[in-house]
Amino acid sequence: MQWEVVIGLEIHTQLATQSKIFSGSATTFGSEPNTQASLVDLGMPGVLPVLNEQAVRMACMFGLAIDAEIGKRNVFARKNYFYPDLPKGYQISQMDLPIVGKGHLDIALEDGTIKRIGVTRAHLEEDAGKSLHEDFSGSTGIDLNRAGTPLLEIVSEPDMRSAKEAVAYVKAIHALVRYLGICDGNMAEGSLRCDCNVSIRPKGQTEFGTRCEIKNVNSFRFIERAINSEIQRQIDLIEDGGKVVQETRLYDPNKDETRSMRSKEEANDYRYFPDPDLLPVVIEDSFLETIRAGLPELPPQKVERFQTQYGLSAYDANVLASSREQADYFEEVVKIGGDAKLAANWVMVELGSLLNKLGVEIDQAPVSAAQLGGMLLRIRDNTISGKIAKTVFEAMAAGEGDADSIIESKGLKQVTDTGAIDKMLDEMLAANAEQVEQYRAADEAKRGKMFGFFVGQAMKASKGKANPGQVNQLLKAKLEG
């Protein structure tokens, strides 16, 4: 039997506010346990929550960016459940009247096609604390620094049909919230976490199968692996005569499998009711228009502009626009270096390899956009060749200065003096007289490879400094003469 996969995602994004959603406590990551928890965060009697306006503003920014309906009147509700890191015994969230309603986000698939993914809703809520197991023998520690950190939970429609589509959607959300500046997107620190709802059904069937939720997956790679593992588990289970049970599961990356965590709760299990300590939030049109006017250029518009303005392919434009920092870096390089396609190649390939090797983001790149742009100018005016440019790039990455100073100090300037190149070629051909005779006796089909030998010898003789175009032109004339 052929199976169709149905995937919906819930993405929890920590909003980049300076203070928590209902208290004035700081949200800095990595502080000593329980040093950023106020009486409000601890759920002490008699204290009242005060809504952080910046969290509301950031949620509205996201809603406008995905062309969603904004709830002009939205209500906070208490989600009741018991867990050690939830001091109040309930979480303040939104249920019936969320701040962001239906919207959509377009994702680019591997074959270049665009698929629209529906967003059901996005609602504001507070994060819970964190249970600590590592440093406690036979017990669990509780860190409430994270309790009350503002979250925007983004709930998709079940529109994805493969793990790769799911990853593309998460990457698109990740890029969008970083472009907007509402979340730093640091998945390793838990700033963006994903719950994956997965089900299967016979191909052609319209009714959904029983879904399982994979909780708190925190990397693109693990999202793909977790979903594929769960898909295979459900297929094997059904084909062996079993039934999928609705439940919450955890992904174990070491064993590459999901395992049962608990039975999946429904909304009525949480006994939602409006929080009596918080008034409904009323959002006026003027508030939204101010936010709309301040929205930055978003990834889809940037991709389109990169293609039309710079003549880039759809693939290159998507890669370069995948983060706001990378897009800005690229445009700064183009502004100085002039050639967009050359700049795109160096940013994606050479700089990308360097960043991967160092394990850093582009905003920590050891080669600045000004340095790279300056080096590209020297390629374009034939001061250095593309091959020599790699040596210059390595030196810039090592902190040895800008391109001009490195070229000067290392004597890397390309030889463009026709007389000097002509003399060097004569000496090289004289040293390879036998190969010259073989070349002249060979038919046209074999000459191409043999010509490459002479080019290599010429570049070796010039220590890579001879202008490749001039070498090719003069060499061909000498060999054919």
UniProtKB/Swiss-Prot annotation:
<dbReference type="GO" id="GO:0050567">
    <property type="term" value="F:glutaminyl-tRNA synthase (glutamine-hydrolyzing) activity"/>
</dbReference>
<dbReference type="InterPro" id="IPR003789">
    <property type="entry name" value="Asn/Gln_tRNA_amidoTrase-B-like"/>
</dbReference>
<keyword id="KW-0436">Ligase</keyword>
<dbReference type="GO" id="GO:0005524">
    <property type="term" value="F:ATP binding"/>
</dbReference>
<dbReference type="InterPro" id="IPR023168">
    <property type="entry name" value="GatB_Yqey_C_2"/>
</dbReference>
<dbReference type="InterPro" id="IPR018027">
    <property type="entry name" value="Asn/Gln_amidotransferase"/>
</dbReference>
<dbReference type="InterPro" id="IPR042114">
    <property type="entry name" value="GatB_C_1"/>
</dbReference>
<dbReference type="Pfam" id="PF02637">
    <property type="entry name" value="GatB_Yqey"/>
</dbReference>
<dbReference type="Pfam" id="PF02934">
    <property type="entry name" value="GatB_N"/>
</dbReference>
<dbReference type="InterPro" id="IPR017958">
    <property type="entry name" value="Gln-tRNA_amidoTrfase_suB_CS"/>
</dbReference>
<keyword id="KW-0547">Nucleotide-binding</keyword>
<dbReference type="GO" id="GO:0006412">
    <property type="term" value="P:translation"/>
</dbReference>
<keyword id="KW-0067">ATP-binding</keyword>
<comment type="function">
    <text>Allows the formation of correctly charged Asn-tRNA(Asn) or Gln-tRNA(Gln) through the transamidation of misacylated Asp-tRNA(Asn) or Glu-tRNA(Gln) in organisms which lack either or both of asparaginyl-tRNA or glutaminyl-tRNA synthetases. The reaction takes place in the presence of glutamine and ATP through an activated phospho-Asp-tRNA(Asn) or phospho-Glu-tRNA(Gln).</text>
</comment>
<dbReference type="InterPro" id="IPR006075">
    <property type="entry name" value="Asn/Gln-tRNA_Trfase_suB/E_cat"/>
</dbReference>
<dbReference type="InterPro" id="IPR017959">
    <property type="entry name" value="Asn/Gln-tRNA_amidoTrfase_suB/E"/>
</dbReference>
<comment type="similarity">
    <text>Belongs to the GatB/GatE family. GatB subfamily.</text>
</comment>
<protein>
    <recommendedName>
        <fullName>Aspartyl/glutamyl-tRNA(Asn/Gln) amidotransferase subunit B</fullName>
        <ecNumber>6.3.5.-</ecNumber>
    </recommendedName>
</protein>
<dbReference type="GO" id="GO:0070681">
    <property type="term" value="P:glutaminyl-tRNAGln biosynthesis via transamidation"/>
</dbReference>
<dbReference type="GO" id="GO:0050566">
    <property type="term" value="F:asparaginyl-tRNA synthase (glutamine-hydrolyzing) activity"/>
</dbReference>
<dbReference type="InterPro" id="IPR004413">
    <property type="entry name" value="GatB"/>
</dbReference>
<keyword id="KW-0648">Protein biosynthesis</keyword>
<dbReference type="InterPro" id="IPR014746">
    <property type="entry name" value="Gln_synth/guanido_kin_cat_dom"/>
</dbReference>
<comment type="subunit">
    <text>Heterotrimer of A, B and C subunits.</text>
</comment>
